[in-house]
Amino acid sequence: YAEFKGKVKRFNYSLGIGGTRSWMSAQGNGYQDYTLRPTISLKYNLTDKSSIKYTANLYSSSPSLSDLENVEQIVDSMQIRRGNSQLKPYMVYAHSLNYEMSKGIFNGGVYVGHRYSDNPIMESTTLENGKFVRSMENQKSWQRLNTEVSISVKPFKDLLTMQFSGGMAHFDSRGLNYHHTYTNWYYNGTINATYKDWSLYGNIKKGRNNFYGETMSRNENFHVIGMNYRHKSLTLGMMTLNPFTKTWKGGDDNYNALAPSKERIYIGNLSKMMVFSVSYNFNFGRKFSSVEKRLNNEDKDSGVLDAGK
């Protein structure tokens, strides 16, 4: 991976290029793929208090070892999970535009992002001998358009901070024999009041759901109220999780035409839960700054086929 950075007056730019080689062979089937990974970042400072930034990158995504294995697993009396040794890597194109500004007690931003996958690996369901066979295939396309607005206010310097962000995510999932669109609105709000060694905070969130293939996965909704007391390196905390709901809910929805399904998770213990915390910061020795790796060549694939519904 190589990267070149530069600055011309109010204009900052960064250009990067990398390469990946993907190779897999299983039971006489497999693939070999070479892909360039270019990235670009352009930032223009409109004023000392506002800027606009554009980023773009493309990369290749490879099938997992478990999905490539030509094996079958029985999910239940009506469903079979099957691997697919014919899966191929696919390209992902991502770009975003971000505007940020600050004026007085206000800070805000607007974000627009788009991600497109060409021939992505997504789920497929067929009917064979009275059983539903679920596997993965290279489908037509998948894309997500995400817009988000954020604002923060500090009316009394650091004594009170209020933050809110909200947005919309639109998904378009095109398979070989299905087409789904899904739009989700989400938000996240926090408030933090601090006085001397005491702090009081609250957080409420409606999560951004995800849609991929034919499955909509629900992100969690929650709210929290808490208090902290800090004395030197010691911090004592207390918070209550979801105090105004009876049950935490989660789950997935599958919109397949042959075998649609809904999965729900209900956890009563995650509502009106009290949490107490104690922490102590041990600060000794030398401090070193760290740099994040841009490229991570690590294999974490167990090769086990997921037998979930």
What are these regions (language model features)?
Residues 1-27, 33-41, 159-163, 168, ...:
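Surface-exposed extracellular loop regions of Gram-negative outer-membrane beta-barrel proteins
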Residues 2-6, 40-44, 97-101, 147-153, ...:
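Residues on the lipid-exposed face of transmembrane beta-strands in outer-membrane beta-barrel proteins
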Residues 8-11, 45-49, 92, 102-106, ...:
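Outer-membrane beta-barrel channels and translocator barrels
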Residues 15-21, 42, 54-58, 99, ...:
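Transmembrane beta-barrel strands of outer-membrane/channel proteins
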Residues 25-34, 65-73, 78-80, 112, ...:
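Outer-membrane beta-barrel translocator domains and adjoining extracellular loop/strand segments
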Residues 48, 60-109, 116, 134-146, ...:
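Outer-membrane beta-barrel signature, preferentially recognizing the C-terminal barrel domain
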Residues 88, 103, 107-168, 174-188:
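Outer membrane beta-barrel strand-and-loop segments of large Gram-negative receptors
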Residues 231-309:
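C-terminal beta-signal and adjacent terminal beta-strands/loops
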